[in-house]
């Protein structure tokens, strides 16, 4: 059965508070599966399985699938629809409260697949990256605006702290755009399927990751201000900051959106040296 048929079979009522939009376009489903490159060596963690349409395809291809679902009304539906699969584990919990490192312990090839509710997209991605969770890739359907921020380059309005965070840890690839007509109920915004492939090492080597991300966040907190004004929030004396900018070879009158990840790394290391 397809998604619409399962929804009708169980007379499921969508929960607006959970941002539920179920995928009904089979071509998008196929592109997610192909893009995620799932094989029998992989453990898949799926966030937001809905009624299990994508989950079935994952179960056919993966070694095992762990699906995380918050909505208690979906639990019996998933249990019934996927009862024939012995490689399926259903977790009834808020994904924001999951200990992903514990879940991934002693598993070698882990890939995440998710149709993320828009309100949890950035917190989930940030947690998975900063907590150094052991995953190979993350294939997600997210709001078009967020995907464009993740995939942005310096000197454009989409480029920001989320861009730097994701590209510090991952290569990014947009798989396809998805129209609102591909879902029930129909969302008000376009979506994009994007894949994040985890790098074996962060894109730049820095002396302090904590300082690096503090510099990045401070640089984008007030986008229209210069680096000099933005980085005053670090509470470093004027002479030391002048020294750091000079050593990094970066003009303090530039704005954060003009710096590459490598330049952010160089600047944070020079600040680290003068602390």
UniProtKB/Swiss-Prot annotation:
It is an enzyme of class 2 (transferase). Its EC number is 2.1.1.182. InterPro entries: KsgA/Erm, rRNA_Ade_diMease-like_C, rRNA_Ade_Mease_Trfase_CS, rRNA_Ade_methylase_Trfase_N, rRNA_adenine_dimethylase, SAM-dependent_MTases_sf. The keyword Nucleus does not apply. S-adenosyl-L-methionine binds at residues 21, 23, 48, 69, 94, 115. It comes from the Bacteria. GO terms for cellular component: cytosol. Coiled coil: none annotated. Keywords: Cytoplasm, Methyltransferase, RNA-binding, rRNA processing, S-adenosyl-L-methionine, Transferase. It is found in: Cytoplasm. Its main location: cytoplasm. One of its GO terms (molecular function) is 16S rRNA (adenine(1518)-N(6)/adenine(1519)-N(6))-dimethyltransferase activity. PROSITE patterns: RRNA_A_DIMETH, SAM_RNA_A_N6_MT. It catalyses: adenosine(1518)/adenosine(1519) in 16S rRNA + 4 S-adenosyl-L-methionine = N(6)-dimethyladenosine(1518)/N(6)-dimethyladenosine(1519) in 16S rRNA + 4 S-adenosyl-L-homocysteine + 4 H(+). Belongs to the class I-like SAM-binding methyltransferase superfamily. rRNA adenine N(6)-methyltransferase family. RsmA subfamily. Specifically dimethylates two adjacent adenosines (A1518 and A1519) in the loop of a conserved hairpin near the 3'-end of 16S rRNA in the 30S particle. May play a critical role in biogenesis of 30S subunits. NCBIfam families: ksgA. This is Ribosomal RNA small subunit methyltransferase A.
